[in-house]
Amino acid sequence: MAVPKRKKSKSRRNMHRSHHAIKPKNIVVCATTGEFMLPHNIAVDNSYKGKRVFIKQKAE
């Protein structure tokens, strides 16, 4: 089992954790609806990059 030879100082501990912060999500505005959404996802109205992707069919 690996055991540290020396105690890691508060400064070095915090420098090690500097990349652990939560980054803000990238939010874009939908071209068709104008709503906020995550990039590379289908919008609420089933459009992607301004084009309809899924067309709802009537239940038979």
From Swiss-Prot:
<dbReference type="InterPro" id="IPR011332">
    <property type="entry name" value="Ribosomal_zn-bd"/>
</dbReference>
<comment type="similarity">
    <text>Belongs to the bacterial ribosomal protein bL32 family.</text>
</comment>
<feature type="region of interest" description="Disordered">
    <location>
        <begin position="1"/>
        <end position="23"/>
    </location>
</feature>
<dbReference type="InterPro" id="IPR002677">
    <property type="entry name" value="Ribosomal_bL32"/>
</dbReference>
<protein>
    <recommendedName>
        <fullName>Large ribosomal subunit protein bL32</fullName>
    </recommendedName>
</protein>
<dbReference type="GO" id="GO:0015934">
    <property type="term" value="C:large ribosomal subunit"/>
</dbReference>
<keyword id="KW-0687">Ribonucleoprotein</keyword>
<dbReference type="GO" id="GO:0006412">
    <property type="term" value="P:translation"/>
</dbReference>
<keyword id="KW-0689">Ribosomal protein</keyword>
<dbReference type="GO" id="GO:0003735">
    <property type="term" value="F:structural constituent of ribosome"/>
</dbReference>
<dbReference type="Pfam" id="PF01783">
    <property type="entry name" value="Ribosomal_L32p"/>
</dbReference>
<dbReference type="InterPro" id="IPR044957">
    <property type="entry name" value="Ribosomal_bL32_bact"/>
</dbReference>
